[in-house]
């Protein structure tokens, strides 16, 4: 009898240890994930702090405006007012144990042009100047105020082919910066019927800059569906086979390929959708429709959450964009989206 009781007690202890260990592992995994927000360049610090609380995030991506005259200009300069505001915010964030990602944010033609289209005339001069800008930010902000992560490039699609230059910049930054270093690449598309799109994808996948960084960052504006509204289930299916233009792009697999090739975690450095119809058609386009649709935006976030939140190779995500709620801020998350995001990695 005593022997039977002893066996039962031993089994209960073993089961208890298993479940405790499982819960601890889950807690550790959750704590290690980045749950971040991107800020509008005209962010308000008070609003940022409110958004941090409402969205239950542990990290903030702080942009420093880099003024660029036009899409072909080599005149690039740190905006002093943006730099000073960033320092003020970073001090507050660190005092609250919020992690900080620092980003030199290309602001082209007063924000009217996309950085994905930036193509400076003098490439050699650009890389020299960009290295100098990063060096300045490291000396005056990143190391001085204990920044956790530095993004060395942001969606410079037309410059991505200069692999050696970017590898040199990553090495330069790693030799000077105390935290982690990442490179942010823009979203892409492939189509079963478009051979060129697949070639472009494999060029991106094989870019050696991804072998040099601590983790891989992606601006995840993948085009999923041409419908005005979708169910969450439809959007989940689209992430494995996009329906827009009958491309049948397997976004999940193509993202996972980066992890399999480089054994580095994947971070959604920008994850955003406009509060409008067709949010899943062109997630990058705030003017995709004239009809507001808070729930469709939330369904897009929910689809990404359901697909990616339990994947160990995903380092986390950053919501684009908060910190300012003006009438033109169509990417600012709706009430429905805030509910989805706040519960992510909880």
Feature map (PLM): residue ranges:
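N-terminal Sec-pathway targeting helices
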Residues: 1-13, 17-21
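Boundary/entry segment of secreted carbohydrate-active catalytic domains
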Residues: 21-57
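Aromatic-rich peripheral "rim/lid" segments of glycoside hydrolase catalytic domains that contact
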Residues: 37-40, 112, 282-346
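Short, acidic/polar
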Residues: 39-54, 126-141, 192-209, 298-307
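Substrate-binding cleft and catalytic face of glycoside hydrolase catalytic domains
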Residues: 55-73, 86-159, 275-281, 320-327
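Glycoside hydrolase catalytic-domain groove-lining segments
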Residues: 82-89, 96, 103, 175, ...
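Aromatic-lined carbohydrate-recognition surfaces of secreted/lumenal glycan-active proteins
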Residues: 101-109, 149-155, 161, 170-201, ...
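Substrate-binding cleft/loops of secretory-pathway carbohydrate-active enzymes
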Residues: 169, 187-219, 223, 276-281, ...
